[in-house]
Amino acid sequence: RPSPLRRARRRVADALVLKRIRAVLGPNMRYIVSGGAPLASDLAQFYTGLGLTLLQGYGLSETTGPIAVQRIGDNPVGTVGQPMPGNFIKTAKDGEVLVRGVSVMPGYYGLPDQTRAVMPDGKWFHTGDLGSIDRRGHLTITGRKKEIIVTAGGKNVSPAVLEDSLSTHPLIAHVIVVGDQRPFVGALIALDAEMLPAWLRKHGLPVCSPTEAASLPQVRESLDRAIERANRAVSRAESIREYRIIDAVFTVENGYVTPSMKLRRSKVLADYSHEVDELYGGPAAPARERGLLRLLRRKKH
């Protein structure tokens, strides 16, 4: 239960700020429903802090829409709710979310091989998403299985945790965590050209282009702090150690972003492979060489 001081602060904030924001949203706004793409936790807390009820859900085309949704009065921030009636959700050993039930398709029409690939036992549909389930059955999505990074040391890293945290920084338009078959985790960062002028003025700096801003010490220091905060949510082996600011704009029109505003990771990595190599001082070692290095490490331990 909030302390008297916190309740007093809430009343002041409501009178001076929150009430005005709610007025912009409209007098009839009571609920906000989010789906289709992950909602950053700070945005979820912001809307909840306005006094609005935020409800999130999760589903795919193969599940006929939502298969998990939050309920009014039972909507913890960060989760996407519990299974819809008649449906069941569990996680595999590797963390992949598996679903079955009345909403789940029986298979892809006329495509038995593709059906077996996603429903090997004929019952549970393998979503390709990674997640966890709490004691009360609330599902939390933590990333995509195909996006898992395996470092040269064999550490599995889910980039979504780091990317979601960094994406909330006003200077960052897009961030992509890298490190597959590399000695450590790194990141490529594209600055937000729209937010940059306001940020520069706020910090007493002359307005300049993203390319020029990339070399400013104040910009670097701000990004360093953001990465330090993001790294607190992961282990040392999973943390970002180096990053590069790239001169790039990713949009739907140029093919780097999907219509649902998701970054096409494979295209970015292919087109910016030179920048990734620069981050690590050269291309990734051949598979045979990586295997020998891992063997030597095991012998040392």
Outline where the language-model segments fall.
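C-terminal boundary motif of the adenylate-forming
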Residues: 130, 169-195
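Adenylate-forming
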Residues: 104, 138-167, 196-217, 236-240, ...
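Glycine-centered loop/turn positions within well-structured domains
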Residues: 75-78, 95-97, 106, 139, ...
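Alpha-helical "lid/cap" subdomains adjacent to substrate-binding clefts that gate access
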Residues: 1-30, 193-233
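Gly/Ser/Thr-rich phosphate-binding loop
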Residues: 1-75, 88, 173
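Conserved C-terminal "lid"/linker of ANL adenylate-forming enzymes
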Residues: 149, 174-177, 183, 224-301
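Conserved ATP-binding/catalytic segment of the ANL
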Residues: 83, 87-151, 168
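Ser/Thr-glycine-rich phosphate-binding loops at phosphate-binding pockets of nucleotides
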Residues: 59-63, 127, 151-152, 258
